Amino acid sequence: MMPLRYSKLNVFAGFPLFLRLNLFTMSKVNIGLVQMSCTGNKEENLKKALAKTKEAATKGAQIVCLQELFTSLYFCDVEDYENFKLAEAIPGPSTDALSAVAKEMGVVIIASLFEKRTQGIYHNTTAVIDADGSYLGKYRKMHIPDDPAYYEKFYFTPGDLGYKVFKTKFATLGVLICWDQWYPEAARITSLMGAEILFYPTAIGWATSQDEATNTEQYNAWQTIQRSHAVANGVHVVSVNRVGLEQNGSMKFWGGSFVSNPFGTFIYKASHEDEETTVVEIDTAKTDSYRTHWPFLRDRRIDSYQPITKRFIDEE
């Protein structure tokens, strides 16, 4: 059976209203993950992402998530003022192109872009576009790293929009970005705001000069922390990473995009090596069952958490 699309609404015009509403409020949602490699050509990367989004939609995807900063190489490996030229307004040219595809294919699109807010203020931002092509808004990355080969503080102002959820045609989405995934507070707040699914567009990899044991440890930690957010909050988690060699071969982005259910079980896991455009079905109706069997939200002691707002709890 082909998935229902925005563009097909007229087919059901003769149905009673309650039946039409029921058809489009089903709890099973098809998630498209686009794991791809990038080049130094922004236009080619965008064209490739649009094609893969269409491919995912053709396979039945209703929500498609692209990786972090998908229109370029991961440029934050160096501090170079020339890279600011890669930024654009949001909404802007890329979101316009994505909106056209969203409307054509009837899919929601989650798109991570380098945002130029104004002169001298830039953000790492994800735009969300609904299945009718309408721009729903954006989330600006809150946690900005500054590590070797990840010099994001040089480029990005920390997000100032707070944590956000987006009510799309198919589900209520929470969107966080890469380094945000290491912080349980971000996942918790977004889940408490009503997110049914947490999405993490990501750009992470390992240095090719680093030993295999360390690389494996880091990769396992990356999976574990995100799966723990799924468990602690009773939500599905979707993480979409880039793949391929960059930085003149010194950095291998490890792919490994995945979907986890609210018990932390992998529903899907991509390879380390290959580009993949995959569609995974999840059932958001099961959230209540997960949360009642493991009632972590019920048992939270919100009266005792004030110390979490401190940088460190010093001895009095």
Annotate each PLM feature.
Residues 285-316:
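A short C-terminal boundary segment appended to hydrolase-like catalytic domains
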Residues 87-110, 178-277:
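CN hydrolase (nitrilase-like) catalytic-core segments centered on the catalytic cysteine
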Residues 31, 129-136, 260-267:
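Short, glycine-anchored, charge-dense loop/turn motifs used at functional sites
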